[in-house]
Regions:
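ATP/NTP phosphate-donor binding region
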Residues: 2-113
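C-terminal charged capping/lid subdomain of soluble metabolic enzymes
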Residues: 2-19, 315-437
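Solvent-exposed alpha-helices and their adjacent loops that cap or buttress functional pockets
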Residues: 24-26, 49, 106-109, 130, ...
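N-terminal low-complexity or amphipathic/hydrophobic leaders
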Residues: 36, 49-63, 187-191, 405, ...
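Gly/Ser/Thr-rich loops at beta-strand to alpha-helix junctions
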Residues: 60-66, 118-124, 145, 272
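A short, small-residue-rich loop immediately preceding and capping a beta-strand
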Residues: 106-143
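A glycine/threonine-rich phosphate-anchoring loop and its flanking beta-alpha core
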Residues: 131-230
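A conserved active-site cap/scaffold subdomain adjacent to cofactor or substrate pockets
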Residues: 226-236, 242-311
Length: 437
């Protein structure tokens, strides 16, 4: 198995070259190692950077799986690592409480480096806090469960609302595929769901580009799409959780995070399927359902998102009318966001401002609309492959999965666009008066 200090770049674009889209993209993660020698290479990295007292951040589970071994390895190299372990085995959230706990500890610490040992929650909490404090951090993944390892944004939950917050990408990633392969199978399924969700995210990005002229980058788009197709084609092997299979999945997830870092937002990897997941997280925070793994939620939502996109974009070339102004929320919509009216209003105001500022780009003829549809065709073409792969990963299409009944699913794909200002197919259908059909 290969050690990747610089993983393959599908675009053949070096990290700081000017792209054909006109931007200069920077991949912040300079070192990515996915190899059975990952912890040895982490220690060598720390020695090169003259670590004396690294702080190792983990939770009760990841401490047992790998964190203690990391501390031992750093100690044997002559360092004096500090241990910060969240005691939770279940239910840890990237919220105000977790941020405060880690921030307080690091402010009082003399640590000269921060190492996050864990998956989604540990990584997001650490990247958010280190960004607040102007510190760097290194990521040591313990599962191929999410795409945020290389990302420069953090998925946080403040006041019960999921928000994408500015943060930093890790300066390096060190992952041992044999550790990743021992993660619970549901975490691997979650990673598959999170990565396959990029299929609908890319259609949403192309749709907004065609309708409103939102900036898009073919290179960044490919950086997500190519690993996505590879994983969709090899889901059965990945579910066997061999080191080779989980390495393939983790590479795809890291590439997705790199793509987000290249454009500075989660747009290449997050569309209405992620908005649905965030909506379900909000319901869980309100006690309306149980929390569920992010990637499983994303994968489940992707089934419905792909169907909506094909319905909206796969028909005849009929030029749509300009979307009607977004009016006051009805009682039904408000009932799903009790206590969060201010946040929802801010999101919708931002979205309306985006639409108003770009209305000149709207396709006013059938021929222009046909170009918009054609622009999404390549992204839409992999929908059958992705839908089949999701089913193989035991992420079904039936109501009841993840404690989500028909009424909640119906509300999700009518109101989840209130969660984020990003334009998606849900906004398109709502603007055309088609969402309730």
């Amino acid at each position: 198995m290969r050690s990747d200090s610089n993983p393959p770049n599908p675009s053949n674009l070096s990290d700081d070259d000017r792209c054909s889209c006109g931007a200069i993209h920077h991949v912040a993660v300079g070192t990515v190692v996915i190899d059975h020698t990952a912890i040895d290479q982490l220690v060598a990295y720390g020695q090169r950077h003259r670590w004396s007292k690294p702080c190792v951040v983990m939770d009760a589970n990841t401490e047992e799986v790998l964190g203690s071994s990391v501390i031992t390895a750093l100690s044997h190299a002559g360092m004096r690592p500090e241990r910060f372990s969240f005691p939770e085995r279940h239910g840890l959230l990237a919220d105000e409480t977790s941020v405060s706990r880690l921030e307080t500890m690091l402010k009082a610490s003399s640590a000269d480096a921060v190492v996050a040992v864990g998956s989604g929650m540990i990584t997001d909490i650490t990247r958010f806090v280190t960004n607040l404090l102007g510190r760097d951090f290194v990521s040591v993944p313990t599962a191929a469960s999410m795409d945020g390892y290389a990302s420069s944004v953090a998925a946080m939950e403040f006041g019960g609302m999921k928000t994408t917050s500015s943060a930093i990408a890790p300066s390096a990633i060190f992952a041992d595929p044999y550790v990743i392969a021992m993660a619970p199978r549901d975490m691997t399924r979650a990673g598959i769901g999170d990565l396959l969700g990029k299929a609908s995210a890319q259609v949403d990005w192309r749709l907004s580009h065609g309708l409103w002229g939102e900036e898009i980058c073919d290179v960044v788009e490919r950086r997500v799409a190519e690993p996505l197709v590879d994983v969709a084609t090899h889901v059965r092997e990945i579910l066997e959780q061999s080191p080779e299979g989980v390495t393939q999945l983790l590479r795809g997830l890291v590439e997705s995070g790199n793509a987000m870092a290249m454009v500075g937002t989660s747009r290449p990897a997050s569309g209405c399927e992620h908005h649905a997941s965030h909506f379900w997280d909000l319901l869980a925070s309100m006690g309306r359902r149980q929390h569920a793994p992010h990637g499983l939620q994303v994968g489940y939502a992707t089934h419905f998102a792909l169907r909506l996109q094909e319905w909206a974009l796969g028909g005849g070339a009929i030029a749509p009318s300009l979307p009607s102004p977004i009016g006051p929320e009805g009682d039904e919509a408000r009932s799903w966001f009790v206590g969060h009216d201010t946040e929802v209003e801010a999101v919708m105001n931002e979205k309306q401002a985006f639409v108003a500022a770009h209305s000149d780009a709207w396709p006013t003829s059938s021929s222009r609309w046909e170009l918009v549809r054609a622009g999404t065709a390549k992204a839409r073409s992999i929908a059958p492959l992705v839908a089949g792969a999701l089913l193989t990963a035991e992420i079904p299409t039936t109501p009841g999965f993840l404690d989500l009944d028909v009424a909640t699913l119906s509300a999700t794909f009518r109101f989840a666009n209130r969660i984020r200002a990003r334009y998606t197919v849900i906004d398109f259908l709502e603007g055309q008066g088609l969402l309730n059909e």
